[in-house]
Amino acid sequence: MSSQYSNVENLSPQTIRQVMKELQDMETTPPEGIKVLINESDVTDIQAFIDGPAGTPYAVGVFRVKLTLSKDFPQTPPKAYFLTKIFHPNVASNGEICVNTLKKDWKPDLGIKHILLTIKCLLIVPNPESALNEEAGKMLLERYDDYSQRARMMTEIHAQPAKCGAGASDAKDDDGPSTKKHAGLDKKLQDKKKEKLLKEKKRMLKRL
């Protein structure tokens, strides 16, 4: 991969080793609800699956996120993006994530694991005060039920495990018998969800 798309050539060997070690540690002992994907040819391109936290509008979803390390990482923070579409105050239309940990609160000793856990926490406690999606931020503050319904609908449409590739909790057997065993059941559940979504969409259109 050329340096036009990657900063791997600009990172020190020590930084590359440190990042790779942390990723391998996370693969061996994954944080709850997070599955990291290792790209051994380019450690500056880090992707992970994050399970939507229980008790939130994102609970049924699995979200793919991407971290892009800057050329002087860890002195400057990486950029973080949701690759899965999501309705959230702190996520821009291009997927960019706004969180203080990756801005003013960044410290060079914060690792990849801390960043991914922070993103997961953002799904639990959004920050409408620093909204990149103003509509979502305003809706969260003024009409939470509508916000929750919209976020849940987007999650059910875009963040299903089959669309994202795999769930974080499926780290051990993405292609094993467990996946095949649940495929039929997942299809039935998704068909039911589609019916429910169509009804919800019709209701929302009537209210517009």
UniProtKB/Swiss-Prot annotation:
Reactions catalysed: S-ubiquitinyl-[E1 ubiquitin-activating enzyme]-L-cysteine + [E2 ubiquitin-conjugating enzyme]-L-cysteine = [E1 ubiquitin-activating enzyme]-L-cysteine + S-ubiquitinyl-[E2 ubiquitin-conjugating enzyme]-L-cysteine
Segment forming the signal sequence: none
Matches recorded under CDD domains: UBCc_UBE2S
InterPro entries referenced in this protein's UniProt entry, alphabetically: Ub_conjugating_enzyme, UBQ-conjugat_E2_core, UBQ-conjugating_AS, UBQ-conjugating_enzyme/RWD
Keyword Cell division: yes
Function: Catalyzes the covalent attachment of ubiquitin to other proteins. Acts as an essential factor of the anaphase promoting complex/cyclosome (APC/C), a cell cycle-regulated ubiquitin ligase that controls progression through mitosis. Acts by specifically elongating polyubiquitin chains initiated by the E2 enzyme vih/UbcH10 on APC/C substrates, enhancing the degradation of APC/C substrates by the proteasome and promoting mitotic exit.
Family recorded in the similarity comment: Belongs to the ubiquitin-conjugating enzyme family.
Name of the protein described by the UniProt record: Ubiquitin-conjugating enzyme E2 S
Organism field: Drosophila virilis
